[in-house]
Amino acid sequence: MKMFKSLSQLPRIVSPFQKCYSTDLISLVGIPRVKITKGQNRYLLVNIHTHGFTKYGRVIVRGADVDNHLTVFDSILEELEPQGICAKILGGGRILNEADSKKMKIYGTSRTFGSADHTRTRNILHSWTTYKDFKITVKN
């Protein structure tokens, strides 16, 4: 009888390990942290996570040369929803990407989503190998 009681505890013990090593969570690693274009970009700072696992998220930067931040958000949803990944917008702004001179300027705010943490955005960009050598300035 004691053995059956012990076995009934097994799902509670195994469940946290299943969540940590789930293939859904590993799929977040396959999502590039940065996708921006050259020139003037409207960008969004986004926290992504697998549906139901908000604790195990990842912050990404997405930007494009578009008229408003909602267009950027729509493209993010088109990219992530088929994979079962949810997105929470942390804020937005603008990035001036001068790839030829290896300079970037992060500034401004999104009227729709509010202001992003530009310093955090800069740190994410610096961690990306493409923009590691760029001089990135932040203006609040």
Swiss-Prot record:
Q: Name one Pfam family in it.
A: Ocnus
In terms of superkingdom, the source organism counts as: Eukaryota
A GO CC term assigned to this protein in UniProt = cytosol
One GO biological process this protein is involved in is: sex differentiation
Q: Which UniProt keywords apply?
A: Differentiation, Sexual differentiation
Q: Where are the transmembrane segments?
A: none
Q: Which residues bind substrate?
A: R42, S110, R111, T112
Which residues does UniProt mark as catalytic? Answer: H69 (proton acceptor)
Gene3D superfamilies named in the record: Janus/Ocnus
The answer to keyword Zinc applying to this record is: no
Q: List the molecular function annotations (GO) for this entry.
A: protein histidine phosphatase activity
For this protein, the record's InterPro entries field holds: Janus, Janus_sf
Q: Which family is this protein grouped under?
A: Belongs to the janus family.
Q: What does this protein do?
A: JanA and janB regulate somatic sex differentiation.
Q: Which PANTHER family match?
A: BCDNA.GH02250-RELATED, JANUS-A/JANUS-B
Can you name this protein? Sex-regulated protein janus-B
This protein's species is Drosophila yakuba
